Amino acid sequence: YIEPLGFGISSLSSAETALRAIGESGASCYRVLIDTFHSYLGPDKPEFFKNPAVIGKIGLVHISGVDARIAKSEFADAHRVLPGAADVMQSATLMAQLEREGYRGLYSFEPFSSEVQSMGKKELVEALRASMNFLAKA
């Protein structure tokens, strides 16, 4: 997979650029990895993901949420939590759009916040269940 990183310092921040490079390489074994966090930060517009050719080239989707009330330019991996109603990135909306457009692949949670890392097993199971239930309703 090729994963565009939406950070301003990233040399590859756009899924569109990644897909163009994959196409021009002629190597059919590559897919783009869409990360809801990096898609929110990067230059790609939601309309980009309405193209069946794009959807067919997505290999995996990483999902996380950001509940923090900070400037978008200050978002960091440490702010990534399990997606829920307070997610300012609206990751569930992007997931629902991808599925409406035909994505049938896998999702992978990527919450890096210390809040999630410090959860006990029972608390984490409940938090994951709540997040999955929230995402299923999108």
Regions found by a protein language model. Name each.
Residues 1-10, 117:
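Active-site-proximal beta-alpha loop/turn segments in soluble metabolic enzymes
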Residues 12-138:
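Histidine-acidic metal/acid-base catalytic patches
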